[in-house]
A protein has these predicted regions:
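Pre-NBD coupling/linker segments of ABC/ABC-like ATPases
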Residues: 1-40, 227-246
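Conserved ABC ATPase "signature" region
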Residues: 20-28, 107, 119-136, 155
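The feature captures the beta-strand-to-loop junction immediately N-terminal to the Walker
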Residues: 55-57
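H-loop/switch region of ABC-family ATPase nucleotide-binding domains
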Residues: 200-201
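Conserved catalytic segment of ABC-fold P-loop ATPases
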Residues: 208-215
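Conserved ABC ATPase "signature" C-loop
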Residues: 218-219, 234
Length: 246
């Protein structure tokens, strides 16, 4: 449940060349800021078991919305009520410690999501198999490719069986075969009445996976409803923009 949620950020007007220069300017009161509004009065009610796609151009507020639901970002105004365990896949590799091994990161992420160390160790082989990284589990995350990190993040987050799963473009780096595996796992989520949000620039993916879609533009909800209808409106808007810019 989100009621009138607004998120504002303060961003410096000028780019400084170093942390030292920034600190000096700040102490001297010479840093001026602009206010960036990422979300503007967003209200949503999502029932358990809903599969919600979130679409919109870059900078529309999609990732900020996910961060608010994940309690990573606190709203400047409004109310947020989230019931149940949330597993966020907000950015590729977010939350992973680069110097720790894949195994250590799985245990760490699992405990942060409410599982015990023993439970995560017991599930380790299954997680590594799903992520297709069995031979690399004890290597540092910094040695992983982007795709390997994304697969491990998805496998870990979905294995802990959260009530709410947030996916922000985390599948965009996977090959079609792995994406199909992810779809199958998300279908299992649906059958068990779990809720998930899918942020994607692939409108066809949203249409195939979700039964509700939200279109964000400049931090506001432009449309909320049937995925095919919402995506059709968004496509038409995007085409008009291309015609104007061309």
């Amino acid at each position: 449940l989100l009621e009138g949620v607004t998120v504002r950020y303060r961003v410096p007007k000028e780019v400084v060349s170093s942390i030292k220069e920034y600190a000096i300017r700040r102490l001297q009161g010479r840093i001026e800021h602009d206010e960036l509004v990422a979300l503007r009065g967003v209200s949503l009610r999502v029932a358990p078991g809903e599969r919600v796609g979130v679409v919109g151009p870059n900078g529309a507020g999609k990732s900020t919305l996910m961060k608010v639901i994940a309690r990573v970002c606190r709203p400047s105004k409004g109310r947020v009520v989230v019931r149940g365990r949330v597993a966020p896949l907000l950015q590729l590799g977010i939350g992973f410690h680069q110097e720790l091994s894949g195994r250590e990161n799985v245990v760490l992420q699992g405990t942060l999501l409410g599982r015990s160390r023993r439970e995560m160790e017991a599930r380790m082989a299954a997680i590594a198999q799903f992520a297709e990284i069995e031979g690399f589990l004890d290597a540092p995350i910094r040695t992983y490719s982007t795709g390997m990190g994304a697969r491990l993040a998805f496998a870990t987050a979905t294995d802990v069986d959260p009530d709410i799963l947030l996916i922000d473009e985390a599948l965009s780096v996977g090959d079609e075969r792995f994406v199909a595996k992810c779809r199958d796992r998300m279908a299992g989520f649906r059958e068990r009445g779990k809720t998930f949000f899918l942020v994607s620039h692939s409108l066809s993916e949203v249409e195939k996976t979700c039964h509700r879609a939200i279109w964000l533009l400049d931090g506001e909800v432009v449309a909320d409803g049937d995925p095919e209808e919402v995506c059709a409106r968004y496509r038409a808007w995007a085409r008009r923009g291309d015609e104007v810019s061309g």
